[in-house]
């Protein structure tokens, strides 16, 4: 993802949707809530990356240790993690996943089309096609 975003810094907008796979990972919902809460303090990606590193142990205690490590305001983090707004955002993201038949992560779309070849070359071809189709003809 970083490589394709770097190749098209002015042409792409990356949108991340939460999709906690709670049927597979018992702590997935808390991890999603933590990423959303950290994002409200400008550290969403950092939280995501740190949680990915400890994905085998995503207990609430471990998640909070990561929040402390990232220097988050813990009162705000706890409030945001448990807020109805965070729950709604995640439920809305899950609704989008259901509506688009997404059932696993990661899943990528470029201009509404499912990316089947997630290599840099595959994504680049789809981005180039979308950009060519978006340009007005002369």
Task: Enumerate the language-model features and the residues they cover.
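Structural alpha/beta surface segment adjacent to cysteine/selenocysteine redox centers
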Residues: 1-68, 128-135
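C-terminal cap of thioredoxin/glutaredoxin-like
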Residues: 1-5, 64-138
């Amino acid at each position: 993802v970083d490589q394709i975003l770097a190749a098209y810094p002015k042409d792409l907008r990356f949108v991340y949707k939460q999709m906690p796979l709670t049927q597979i990972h018992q702590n997935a919902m808390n991890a999603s809530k933590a990423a959303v809460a950290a994002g409200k303090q400008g550290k969403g990606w950092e939280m995501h990356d740190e949680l990915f590193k400890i994905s085998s142990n995503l207990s609430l205690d471990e998640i909070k240790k990561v929040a402390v490590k990232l220097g988050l305001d813990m009162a705000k983090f706890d409030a945001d993690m448990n807020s109805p707004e965070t729950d709604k955002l995640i439920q809305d993201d899950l609704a989008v996943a259901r509506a688009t038949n997404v059932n696993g992560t990661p899943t990528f779309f470029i201009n509404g089309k499912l990316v089947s070849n997630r290599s840099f070359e595959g994504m680049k071809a789809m981005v180039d096609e979308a950009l060519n189709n978006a340009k007005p003809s002369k």
